[in-house]
Every structure is written in C-alpha cells, then in structure tokens.
Amino acid sequence: MSGLSKLLKSIYNEDIKIKILDEIRKEEENLEEEIEKEIEEQKKHKKDSEVYDAVLTHNIPVIAYDEGGKFITEMKWGIMFDPVKKTPLIFNSRDDTIGMKPFWKNLFDKNRILIPMTGFYEWKDIGQKKKLKIKIVLKRKEIFFVPGLYWKNKEGKREFSLVTTSPSRFLIEIHNRMPVILDDDDSVLNYFTDSLEENLAKLKPSQEEIITEEMQS
C-alpha cells in the first residue's frame, strides 16, 4: 500500500455514504501532489478518526480535467438547476438519459468528472414497506472510479451527479440501479481524453464481483 493510500485512509473512515479514496498511478506524480495538498488542507480541519460522510449537498473530492491535465477539486453532490423554483435535486444521472437527450449528453461530454470510491450503499426492498441497508464493495478492487458530470450554477459553483446504469448480475437482487464503474485501467486513464462515443460505450453494468454486508439501521 502506498504512502498516499495510507494517508487517505487516516482521514476518510471506511463506513461512509460514498467512501472517497483517491489513489492514482504512481507515474501521475503531478496529480498525486495535488491530492497530498488537498489532504493536508483537510487535516487542518479534521481529526484522523472523524467520519467523512459524502452525502447529498456535501462538497466532496472529485477528479476533473482542463488544459493543464487532471486535478483534484471539490464539488457539491446534487444538481439544482433553479433554487428559486426549487427544482428537484439531481444526484444520479441515468446512462440511457445521457445517451438520448442532447442536454445531458453535452454535459457528459464537456463537464465530465470521476468520483473515486471504495464502496457504496444500496437499500434492498424486503417487503412490508421495509428496506435493508446494504454495504457494497468490490471483491478485487479496493478503489474504483465512477463517471459523473457537473453543472455550474449562477454563483459559478459546480454541482455534480454520478452516472448510474442497470444492475450487474451480482447486484440485481439488491437494487434496480447501480453506479457505473469503470472496470479496467485504460477506461479510467483515458476517460478525459476519449471521445464522447467512446465514453458512452463505457456506461454499462460492471462485471466486477462484489462483497455485501447488511448494515444495522
């Protein structure tokens, strides 16, 4: 385990809504330096044992891209297009909607991001209007990356949603949707430079095996 991974683990608790950990390939030294700076800044405001809950409307770290390359920044999870009219908060963007509707397709093309995770939670319907909270991690990957897109609001602040797709064969008994997970390294490393069509083709259920754990309510 790299020093970067250990440092991240000292800040971010394992059991969080979407568990954020950023570990990039060693050759991407510039990005690792940015991550280290971000962590050091957060350490000024957090105790090592404090839980970092990435829930709706929170600012969380994401990976973005501009002419200077990849970089770490914080964006608010949840897009609200019109706060005055109180339009619904959009925290997930469906893959089929992105593929069919020009507005969402353009956002995904021009404003794409990656959200690093170590796991996520889903709510399984167990009948009688009851749901069971399930913790989901990947069997062979400690860290994985989920595509997302962002919108810049009237104040110039960026808000994002993550991209979801149909459930994999491993998740279908738990929930009818799941985050898109980029299964291979090339999909992650080329995500910001691949064409729109190439990235749309990546929006599909993951083939990675999962480990599940029932959580106490």
Question: Residue ranges of each PLM-predicted region?
Answer:
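Short linear sequence motif anchored by a di-proline
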Residues: 1-217
